[in-house]
């Protein structure tokens, strides 16, 4: 499973434009979405969101945990496990974003998690396991 932070997210975190008090969401997309970490900055840049029973456009709210790691000199952000019950969907990736509550062109992208292959639920529970992103590097 590969994860990457969008360049704009790293910039927003360091500038203080995004923090742990913000509202975050996770949306599911198909394998047809090709992320571009350099140019995709807003939710409106994301294509091929999944559709299906038990899934609402825009995804679900998540409450991440931000931890300063003074040993490895980085910020660790953990997004919790999310489930869609009684769902019939096929997803390849999860896209996390800061939600502003208006147009998708205002919502800042955080990171994308590629599952490596399609994950399918057929009238059951789709479970997205917790994901961690680390910003910074060892000294």
Question: Would you name each region that the model predicts?
Answer:
Residues 1-92, 99-139:
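Small cysteine-rich, disulfide-bonded extracellular modules of the LU/uPAR three-finger superfamily
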